[in-house]
A protein has these predicted regions:
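Well-ordered secondary-structure scaffolds
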Residues: 187-188, 302
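Conserved nucleotide- and phosphate/pyrophosphate-binding catalytic cores
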Residues: 196-304
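NTP-dependent nucleotidyl-transfer catalytic core
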Residues: 1-183, 190-193, 200-205, 218
Length: 304
């Protein structure tokens, strides 16, 4: 299915998953009041891992959202007010619950990093975490490199450190040993892995998924009208349906692997389809399987 882009310590990580029930986390900053199509990879990833018997922790990044992730940005993000961030958390939490079973904390949890980040003592953090980060190395990270010409604020420079601290906190609190995220988060995620290994001398890992892009490298999830949201109040069911109807053939086949639980044999069978047949088959599978995981799927069925 090509669900993995990169991972740390591949052999160790495979053994780690095979030997035990693993606690994994995925962090999402509440910078909007709804997820969009680009977030489906992370939401489905958590659902898959939970289905495989592991525990997933969905982390709402209300604390890190106060800073703003510089990854992939050419300028500093607008600073959000605390009230807006809290309102976004409330809406996004409801959407997460459509993918992840949060009723049993042994299977899934939803936490907010503002609960621990806002309580931090700056000097204590510097002493605990600071010695384990090299500024020279941080400046070579992809998330910072592209900003060196246009300017990188000290505020944003701290984002990697706080995200790494999240992983450390979750490791100590819940024995969380794996972080997952999009491939554009690779540099930030490495910081947390290395921090835990240096402080606790134990295994911690991260793995990323490929970014959802078209064949020419453009991120999926946006149209000329803007983002394609999962909230039906922001993107109507018909508009959502039309977005998927217009997905190019190569991406339709890829999405079938990403967003369904179809066995590999069925996915391979779809490779024989050409042109519009790929998309028609994709939509038919949504009908047949009645995939209720996402607003995306259930509302597609309503329109169909």
């Amino acid at each position: 299915r090509n669900l993995i882009a990169q991972m740390t310590h591949p052999e160790e990580l495979e053994k780690h998953f095979n030997d035990q029930k693993v606690t994994i986390y995925h962090g999402m900053d509440p910078t909007a009041d709804s997820f969009h199509v680009g977030h489906l990879m992370g939401l489905m990833y958590m659902a898959r891992l939970q289905k495989a018997g592991h525990r997933v922790i969905a982390v709402m990044g209300a604390g890190t959202a106060m800073i703003g992730d510089p990854s992939g940005k050419t300028s500093m993000r607008p600073m959000l007010k605390r009230e807006q961030i809290d309102a976004n958390v409330k809406n996004l939490s409801k959407q997460i619950s459509k993918f992840v079973d949060l009723a049993n904390p042994e299977k899934g949890m939803l936490v907010n990093n503002a609960d621990w980040l806002l309580k931090l003592n700056y000097l204590e953090v510097l002493r605990e975490v600071g010695p384990h980060f090299s500024v020279n190395r941080m400046l070579t990270a992809d998330c910072f490199k592209s900003r060196m010409e246009s300017g990188l604020s000290f505020l944003e420079f701290n984002y990697m450190i706080l995200q790494s601290y999240d992983f450390l906190h979750l490791y100590k609190q819940y024995k969380c040993s794996v972080q997952i995220g999009g491939d554009d988060q690779w540099s930030n995620m490495l910081g947390g892995v290395e921090l835990i290994r240096r402080i606790h001398r134990t295994g911690s890992y991260c793995l990323t998924w490929p970014l959802l892009t078209t064949s020419d490298g453009k991120k999926m999830g946006k149209t000329e009208q803007g983002a394609v949201w999962l909230d039906p109040e922001k993107t109507s069911p018909y508009e959502y349906y039309q977005y998927w109807r217009n997905v190019e053939d190569a991406s339709a086949l890829k999405c079938l692997g990403y967003f369904t639980y179809l066995p590999q044999s069925e996915l391979d069978a779809h490779k024989k389809f050409k042109g519009q047949d790929v998309l028609n088959s994709f939509m038919e599978k949504l009908r047949q399987k009645k995939l209720k995981r996402a607003r995306a799927n259930s509302l597609l069925l309503e329109v169909l």
